[in-house]
Amino acid sequence: MKKNSITSSSISKTANLKAEIINISDEATIGENVKISAKEIYISRGCKVEEGTNISATGTIFLGDFTLIGANSIIQVNNLTLMDYSKLQRNMFMNGGNDCFIGYNSWIGSNCILNVAESLYIGNGVGIGTYSSVWTHGHHGELLEGCKIHKVSPVRIENDVWILGCYNVISPGVVVGEKALVMTGSIVTKDVPPMTAVGGNPAKSIPSLAPYEEVTVEDKLVKMTSFIQEFCELFTSSKKLSGEKSSWLIESEYGSHTIVIVDSTEELESLEYSIAIVKKGLREEKEYKGSVFDLSSKYYYKTSSKIEIKFIQFLLYEKARFMPINGHTRKYER
């Protein structure tokens, strides 16, 4: 990326950006009275930083495609990474001077506190309800006078965790496992195993509540077919095509688009499509004609077409979440 590439016409004249390297997509939006300062700033396509927000980093700020940082948020970190389609709603307060990494398709409600005195990792598809707080440090008592409560420790919130409702607290050093559920008003002081529901103060396991049930790829296919039919209804002209393959033709302001469902990517070689749903077989090293969504791996081949973006935004956040197998490659390195 070249130094200081600012081509967006959607940057407010009252916005103030300072960095050694600034690279902003011409499809990003920076609101009024926004202040962003860092060593390096990268703001991607469709990203919105709303009015009155103040972001400062000693290192790098990276905001992926169609991300959001809501109005009047305050962020003070070392490095900030926010991957595609993740959203931080208004009045976010994030401080502490360490690194914060937030993966793809995550949603964090308004008025949350994310403390980064130590590193904070939030995975893909995480949901955190409003007025919740995540703490990587807990100290105030005077050590000179013998206070024994003093902790600074990283926090990890793994993929597809749902911190439900509001007023939840995640304590320093905690790991919340993949697809865990934290009920409203919980104080989490210990690690939460994957696929476990917890609640209360302090939060304890709720064995009677299973956050997820096991599904097969065939189950996913049935659900995705229903989602596609619902998606097609958004357009004034759409129809299901006859033939051996499940396929639909839609007309949008972007043109004509075909959506197909096949068993594997090998079947796509002879087909024309804008969006394809496959049971398996998506490969990182291969190029495809259109956007391909793999139900087994939950990855997709990213083309950044307008119909792909509309489809992803339709699926988010509760229907289905996919991660790009190509495109942005930033990773959490701790």
Predicted regions and their residues:
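Terminal amphipathic alpha-helical/low-complexity segments used for targeting or macromolecular assembly
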Residues: M1-T14, A19, D26-E27, G46, ...
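Conserved catalytic segment of ABC-fold P-loop ATPases
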Residues: G177-A180, P193-M195
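Residues that flank catalytic or metal-binding motifs in active/ligand-binding sites
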Residues: T130, T184, P194
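A generic "structured core" feature
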Residues: E158-D160, L181-I187
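Conserved active-site beta-strand element of glycosyltransferases/polysaccharide synthases
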Residues: V198
